[in-house]
Amino acid sequence: MTRMQGARIRYTPTTAPEMGTETKRNMEVLLEADPAKSAGQGFGSAGQYLDVCIKTDTDTLDGYGLRIIRTAAHSDAVSMYLIQYVREQAQCISREVVTNCFVTGCRIWVRYENGILSAKAWTVTEPTVVQQERGYARGVELTAEVGRRENAENTGLLIWHTGSLGTENWRNTTMLHGVSILYF
C-alpha cells in the first residue's frame, strides 16, 4: 500500500471574454484557515507547510505566494514569508516573520498588483501568555517587488498543504473556508 501525505488545490480560471481575466493583470485571494493544531504550530512536524499562491501557472507551478511553515525552532508558532515558484521550486523573496496567528480563524490575504506582491495573515484568537512573552507577531504583513513581466499572464491559484493527517486521521489537518479570488 502506498501512503501519501499533503494535498494540492489548483485552480485555473476560464479565460473567455465574458470572464475578463485576459485583460486583468492583478489578482488577490482571501481565505480563512482553521488548523487542527491549536497551540499555533500549525502542522505535525517541522518542515511541513501551507503555500497560498497566486499568479500561478498551474501546470509548471511558476508563480508567487505566501509560505506558512512549521520550523524546529518553535512548538507554538510558525514562520511566514513570501515565495516565488520557478519550475516547482520555491525560493524566499521576503523577510521571515515568526507568528502565532496560524490558529482557528486565521485569515490569509495574498495580492499581486502592478509588480508588487503583498500578504497579510491575522486572527482574532488571543495568544497564550507564553506566546506573548516570547514576542511572536500577532499578525503578518509582507511585501516584495516581483516585477511586472514575469508571470504576468498567469491567473491560477495554488494551495499546497504538505502536512500529514496525524492521529485519528485529522489532528494535523487544516480546514479551509470561503476561498475568494478577485481579478482586477
Give the ranges of each region predicted by the language model.
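Secretory/extracellular carbohydrate-interaction modules
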Residues: T2-Y81
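Acidic Ser/Thr/Pro-rich low-complexity disordered segments
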Residues: D59-A72, Q91, T125-L142
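Short, aromatic/His-centered strand-loop micro-motif at the edge of beta-sheets
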Residues: Q84-W109
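Ligand-recognition surfaces built from glycine- and aromatic
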Residues: K24-N26, Q131-Q132, A137-F184
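Predominantly extracellular/luminal cell-surface or secreted proteins
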Residues: C53-D57, I83-Y85, K120-V124, F184
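Beta-strand elements of well-folded, non-transmembrane domains
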Residues: A33-K37, T58, V86, Y112-N114, ...
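Carbohydrate-binding surfaces in secreted/extracellular proteins
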Residues: V29, N100-A144
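Residues within well-ordered beta-strands of beta-sheet-rich folds
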Residues: N26-D34, D51-C53, G65-R67, R107-E113, ...
